[in-house]
Amino acid sequence: VRDPDTGEPARSPALYKEVTERIRDSKTDVIINLTAGMGGDVVFGPIEAPLPLLPTTDMVGASERMQHVIECRPEICTLDCGTMNFADDVMANTPSILRSMAKIANDCDVRIEIEAFDTGHLWFAKQLVKEGIIRDPVLIQLCMGIPWGAPDDLNTFMAMVNNIPNDWVFSAFSIGKNQ
């Protein structure tokens, strides 16, 4: 969702609740899928003085990152399955935070949609399934063309597809010209 005053992305549970209630009140038969990716943004200072982190850093714990999911109870929520450089910033998702977020989703009976931005994210997703943290059927979204994750060329796409277990349900998207 976006902050109506600034137009910037927001993780306010009240804004998510307003949107999900509007959708449900419309009686439209759709599956609601909310992001759980916000709250993991690390923005470093200048190259020669990266600390302290810049005020635009938005890094909070697993419970706060999942608060809108707890309150809104969508059918699905995303789980960004790893840390990566994201343009000039860092999207930080440690294994322990991801395990905690997945447990919260499971406790709320919300289906997890894994978001894999690179091949290492697939590797960790398989580990979460092996540990029983992510339930069948496993849903995974391949997120292509995000700077500096997996490029959106056919070879990289096929490498990722070929690493998805046959019993998982996958989809994919790209940003930019290959969208």
Region locations from a protein language model:
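Alpha-helix N-cap and loop-to-helix initiation/capping positions
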Residues: 7-15, 53-57, 61, 89-97, ...
